[in-house]
Amino acid sequence: MGNYKSNLETKIGVVKNPILVSCRESIMENKKSFYGRFYIGPLEVGQGITLANALRRALLSELNGLAITTVEIEGVSHEYSTLMGVRESVLDILLNLKQIVLKSKKSVKRAQTAYIYCQGPGVIRAGDIILPSSIQCVDPEQYIATLSSDGILKMKVIIRQGKNYLVQTPNSLFFDEVSEFVLDKNNLAEKRSEKQSFQHKIFLQNSVNKKKWGKVEEKKEPKLSFFSHSGSRPSFLFKTKVGLKSKALTFSFQNSRSLYTISQNSKNKELFINLFKKQIYSILALKVSITKSQDPNNFSNLLCSFFLTSKNKTKPLFIDAVFMPVTKVNYTLEENKQKLFDEIYPIVSNDNLEKNWVKVKKSGFFLSNQQLSFEKNSLFEESKLQQNTNNEAKHKNNGNGKFVDSKLLKQSTTSNFDYNYWSLFSAELNNNSSSWTTLNSNIFFEHFNQSPKDIIILEIWTNGSILPRTALKHATQNLSNLFIKFQNAKMMKNSFFETNKTYTQTIRQLYEKYQNF
């Protein structure tokens, strides 16, 4: 028995009265709904509701999840527009994208980009999204849109990781576009409205500041500049002199280094390649602008050939994302031991007493011969007591002439209840091959059997991106980390109660100020 006790202490970390968690039921209702039911206990009366509330709040608000936050659809500037060849409106497409559930095996710290490029006829589903390698779709059959024979849908999706939910308000002055081109003329800022010319005015102001330092020559010719909205990120900007009647183009970089020198000296080769691609796109943008001034009718066809769209036609659309992987949490508290005992193990009657006693005897709790005989006789006495309505203090024991104290009888029924009570939480108690079956529960859990305990029955529903038991594990870790930080917190030094002398001085000063009033 000593060896078994030491093994148990090493398993539970020398905790005399541990809290056990048992997954009693786990069901996959559909691809986007997992259900789990857990028994947590035993807890002292009053502790159950404290722990249950904390677990529920942690499950609903402390777990990370993935969601689509921003969408860019080619040729769409707002969510109330429609697309040619697409059955759904843009608003319906955004709502369908919001319902897509994503999961990842590792933490996603940066925003990820996914793409959709489909041509009709056909049905677009979540499985058609080109996702990063680290992100998966829970339900690939999630419906997005239906295309006709002439329908084409090009879409860019931004995926982020977060907690709770995200409410976004669209701002016309901030867009996450990669780049755009603006034709800067002298009187263009004055003719446009204040909102439309906000970015244009900023560019003019920056150019004026550069003129003061002599970096840019003062010329009245219109300049075509290529820049990004981020502003803070460095980019290879170049300026081009465009004559309205001239077809010649002359390019000049801000620095005099060649492309080969820049590529050799650049620390990040991939960044240089991306920037060089932007330069190529800018050349196409310049050609498009000149072609527009010469032949406006052929401008739309040229845009389609270069896969470019006008600035005002494509804008990012924001989605109010929901990151919570746990959709619903319910809990109930059971404070009566006898109620749980009656639900799982029916009350012993005279007819099946011997049958039930054999089941208890084969349970694996190895008691001594005297204890076994005493338990059996006590169960017979309990069945007789249930038939009699009188409340006598002493009862005869099977006609042997001996008297059994009612306290001893209560202890015997309690010891029988120990096995049934702890089998609620641990499946190992029902397994004869387990080392737990050779232990008597009274040795380690005697303090818990003296009074009723709280048992938490916790029900968890997830959206399919995480298992209920994994969600419970992460919520428990978050709570434990929070309380560990609180336990290791240091009290700030406060001289108010440091010594009696400072305390009396402070009280005297407060009293003097009070008298002055």
Swiss-Prot record:
CDD domains: RNAP_alpha_NTD. One of its GO terms (molecular function) is DNA-directed RNA polymerase activity. InterPro entries: DNA-dir_RNA_pol_insert, DNA-dir_RNA_pol_RpoA/D/Rpb3, RBP11-like, RNApol_insert_sf. Pfam families: RNA_pol_A_bac, RNA_pol_L. It is found in: Plastid, Chloroplast. SUPFAM superfamilies: Insert subdomain of RNA polymerase alpha subunit (SSF56553), RBP11-like subunits of RNA polymerase (SSF55257). It catalyses: RNA(n) + a ribonucleoside 5'-triphosphate = RNA(n+1) + diphosphate. One of its GO terms (cellular component) is DNA-directed RNA polymerase complex. It comes from the Eukaryota. Its EC number is 2.7.7.6. GO terms for biological process: DNA-templated transcription. Keywords: Chloroplast, DNA-directed RNA polymerase, Nucleotidyltransferase, Plastid, Transcription, Transferase. In plastids the minimal PEP RNA polymerase catalytic core is composed of four subunits: alpha, beta, beta', and beta''. When a (nuclear-encoded) sigma factor is associated with the core the holoenzyme is formed, which can initiate transcription. The N-terminal domain is essential for RNAP assembly and basal transcription, whereas the C-terminal domain is involved in interaction with transcriptional regulators and with upstream promoter elements. DNA-dependent RNA polymerase catalyzes the transcription of DNA into RNA using the four ribonucleoside triphosphates as substrates. Belongs to the RNA polymerase alpha chain family. This is DNA-directed RNA polymerase subunit alpha. It comes from Stigeoclonium helveticum.
